[in-house]
Amino acid sequence: QTYSFIGQNTPAARRVLSALQRHWGVSGPEHVKSAVGVAHAYDLTHLLARAIQKAGTTDRRKVRDAMEQLGPYDGLIQRYAQPFTATRHEALSARNIFFARYTADDRLVPIPAGRSSPP
């Protein structure tokens, strides 16, 4: 996993979780079925929109160049100091990964760092 809504209290996390609860009936952060998919789509959509705005066009090369020059962005997954560069086209790293498990009542919960097995 690279994201869970559990324990997240950023403005973006509160806004997105509220929308999921309102529009999709999600009862709580542990019931977001694909928090990773939601977070990746949210962050990438916003980064791409910023790059298109910066480029002033949807031309592929110009958007790529603009993405490589984006400044800081407060996303769901993390605060991206510089999401992409000319030599790094992956905004996340191994430090963003954690393990999670489904409970018997179908909640997706992170496994605390340093634990060798789920609680």
What function would you assign to each model-found segment?
Residues 1-119:
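Extracytosolic ligand-binding ectodomains
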